[in-house]
């Protein structure tokens, strides 16, 4: 049976398998075969796998094969991500553009397309949303504005996520959890015990987890956003990640200038 790893805790992997006649699927608690350790291969959240069901009633299984990956992120450690959705608030709190740019660069370094989502458009009293959208669309990023509180723009996000695995990130206070709740509204997996199984991991550091929100559509809630750091990058390389600045380079009379003053 084929499935996708949605969470890993303490050597257990939770595999989401879509059954015939059950589009929301079933989650099985699985162990990975020792051959993966021997081959120095570690299953990751997001991996597509072949599994054997050991106990259908208890939803237990074994992962016997890791299927080829089309992408692999290092931060967070996850496989087969198609795109990233980064969420900031238009206001309350004010967006930290330095943090946003760092995330965009980090995803570009790993060849992952990014969608920028500005939440809380319902309280945008200063009319900033069009300014923010223009800045990042000029840089080549798909940028949308929504309101989780008013459920405005949710259909747009759902359409952008359809049929893909998307890592979702954002600092605290921007309404990321509210948006995730809107996206997964009405999606219930067959097994009612998955939440109980995953409770075992409460004593551990928070893990990344894939959430199935529609058929073949997953979102990954990304922890640790505020402590983002870039991979090693020389300042001369930063220009590659700011294409919107390229048209102005010819006006600088200093060769090799970093344009920092």
Regions found by a protein language model. Name each.
Residues 91-140:
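Phosphate-binding glycine-rich loops and their immediate beta-loop-alpha structural context
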Residues 11, 24, 34, 39-59, ...:
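Helix-rich effector regions associated with P-loop NTPase G domains
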Residues 122-174:
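Canonical P-loop GTPase G-domain recognition
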Residues 176-192:
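A conserved segment at the C-terminal end of the G1
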Residues 94, 124, 152, 186, ...:
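Catalytic P-loop NTPase motifs of RecA-like helicase/translocase cores
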Residues 13-19, 30, 51:
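SH3/SH3-like beta-barrel fold
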Residues 1-10:
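Structural detector for short beta-strands of small beta-barrel domains
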């Amino acid at each position: 049976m084929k499935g996708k790893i949605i969470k890993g805790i303490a050597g257990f992997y939770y595999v989401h398998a879509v059954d015939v006649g059950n589009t929301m699927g079933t989650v099985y608690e699985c162990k990975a075969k020792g051959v993966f350790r021997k081959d120095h291969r570690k299953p990751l959240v997001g991996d597509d796998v072949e599994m054997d069901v050991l106990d259908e009633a208890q939803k237990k299984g074994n992962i016997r094969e890791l299927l080829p990956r089309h992408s692999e992120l290092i931060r967070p450690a996850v496989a087969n991500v198609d795109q990233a959705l980064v969420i900031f608030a238009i206001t309350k709190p004010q967006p930290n553009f330095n943090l946003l740019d760092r995330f965009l660069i980090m995803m570009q370094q790993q060849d992952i397309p990014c969608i920028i989502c500005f939440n809380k458009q319902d309280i945008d009293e200063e009319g900033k949303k069009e300014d923010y959208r223009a800045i990042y669309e000029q840089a080549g990023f798909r940028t949308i504005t929504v309101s989780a509180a008013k459920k405005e723009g949710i259909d747009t996000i759902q359409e952008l996520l359809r049929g893909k695995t998307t890592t979702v990130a954002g600092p605290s206070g921007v309404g990321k959890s509210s948006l995730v709740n809107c996206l997964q509204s009405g999606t219930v997996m067959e097994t009612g015990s998955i939440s109980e199984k995953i409770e075992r991991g409460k004593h551990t550091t928070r893990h990344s987890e894939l959430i199935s929100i529609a058929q073949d559509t997953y979102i990954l809630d990304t922890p640790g956003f505020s402590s983002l750091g870039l991979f090693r990058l020389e300042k001369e390389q930063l220009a590659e990640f700011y294409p919107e600045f390229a048209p102005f380079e010819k006006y600088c009379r200093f060769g090799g200038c970093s344009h920092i003053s």
